[in-house]
């Protein structure tokens, strides 16, 4: 019985130390995502001089033909809103990661709405429109609504 007790205590100690990982890498990654988007959006705003922004939010995809459809959609919004800078993002983390890895073709970097909303706010756009391109309301749409409410 004593050996079992000692073994369990040692096992618990090993598991405890293993679970106490420092999360600096993920914190740094989040800071990097915000910084990268802030710089890109600020550069776009400085280049265009526009004070309105449109953020298009799709669930996402990893297929090249879907990327072409997203590009066409963004272009249609740019044509419809010539006085606004148009940004595009994915709400699905899985699609963001797989698109970045180039799972089914070219690699594309898309970001979560919260990163672009932060960057748009930091760039001091006066008017921001957020348009969901979600086909059905799900968890990602609820997350988008929550992110917009925090931003407002």
For each predicted feature, which ranges?
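Active-site-proximal alpha-helix that buttresses catalytic centers in soluble enzyme cores
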Residues: 21-152
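Bacterial N-terminal signal peptides that target proteins for export
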Residues: 1-8
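C-terminal motif of bacterial Sec signal peptides marking the signal peptidase cleavage site
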Residues: 15-19
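Short, linear, compositionally biased motifs with a strong N-terminal bias
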Residues: 10-13
């Amino acid at each position: 019985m004593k050996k079992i007790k000692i073994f369990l205590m040692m096992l618990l100690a090993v598991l405890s130390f293993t679970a106490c990982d420092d999360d600096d890498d993920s914190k740094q990654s989040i800071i990097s995502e915000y910084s990268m988007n802030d710089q890109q959006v600020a550069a776009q705003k400085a280049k265009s001089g526009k004070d309105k922004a449109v953020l298009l939010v799709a669930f996402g995809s990893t297929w090249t033909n879907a990327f072409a459809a997203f590009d066409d959609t963004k272009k249609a919004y740019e044509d419809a809103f010539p006085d606004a800078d148009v940004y595009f993002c994915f709400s699905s983390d899985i699609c963001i990661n797989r698109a970045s890895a180039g799972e089914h073709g070219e690699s594309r970097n898309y970001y979560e709405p919260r990163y672009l909303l932060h960057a748009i706010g930091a760039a001091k756009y006066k008017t921001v429109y957020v348009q969901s391109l979600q086909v059905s309301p799900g968890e990602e749409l609820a997350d988008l609504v929550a992110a917009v409410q925090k931003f407002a």
